[in-house]
Amino acid sequence: MKLVYQLALTQIKGVGNTLAKQLIDHCGSAEEVFRSSKKQLMLIPGIGERVAGNILHKEVMNAVEKEVAFIDKHKIKVLFWSEPEYPVKLKQCIDAPVLLYFKGNANLQTKKVISIVGTRNASEYGKSICEEFVASFRQEDVLVVSGLAHGIDSFAHEACLKNQIATVGVLGHGLDRIYPAINRTLATDMLKNGGLLTEYPSGTNPDRQNFPSRNRIIAGLADVTVVVEATIKGGALITAEIANAYNRDVCAFPGDIKRQSSSGCNHLIKTHRAHLISSAKDLAYLMNWDLTSEKKEEKQLSLEIILNPEEKHVFDIVKESGSIGIDALAYKTNLTQSKLAILLLELEMKGVLIALPGKMYRTP
């Protein structure tokens, strides 16, 4: 019965996501919203006589019966804003949808979530970058989110499936259809290692106005949004702007300055709205993520052979400290900062130290 009230809350005329959350905060649950009297509802800020009447109208409850049957038949999970199953990263966003429909097996609470977006008219360059970038995470516990559209979205999902990486497609319509239709097989395959997610009930068409709203979910689910290839006037840049508004990291691959399909990425980088990256290692560095693949690629040479005594001394202190700033390191090594800077650069070049933001250093 709880599900019926949750669904009904999203069907009320005049009640959007913000007001729905406000109703839940005041009443305690979706069920209590509908058990409240008109007088009680009108005491809540933003609820006037008309909206209170809409909430208590019997047609609201009757309208969700068909949706409940669809959910049961297709084994769809309903993720409600006030419940622990709701994606934590998305819940932090002020305009997050109050309810989501999810079909699949992905863990939406995965610690490392990457959104990949880009143009529908991807070039071979964009496709190659996307596939290579995704493949770099095949040994990592990551979730890749995209929009199941033509072009970069599809390439990202396909590369994930090829490399056994969980991937979720966020839709701008109900789960009773797939748009574009050519991606039906891809969508079915994603249910085995990932899934499909939408805020829209069954029967919702892929109308144009739905996709900017869809983009906020793509941005909100992730720690970082990566723009692979995009024009200036594309949906990918909308997603990037939303991610920036959420104070999430945005990265972009640079492209040919004369190629229209790279103009959006270059613009994001030029205007400091995205970090320039050229590989998964660049992203891992930015996010301070450890990559399993990097550890396995370490050279099996002893430190005594590849490091001179001064380098070995600096390395040992960094390793013992876990991570350390250059000032503290200069104090512990009794070296000048200029001398230390040279040694640190040499250690970075040899792959035994990693530089972090804020002049911090750690071992791989």
How would you name each of these model-derived features?
Residues 3, 72, 80-364:
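Glycine-biased, small-residue-rich flexible motifs in mid-sequence functional cores and linkers
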Residues 1-85, 268, 326, 350-359, ...:
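Short, small/acidic-rich helices and loops at N termini and domain boundaries
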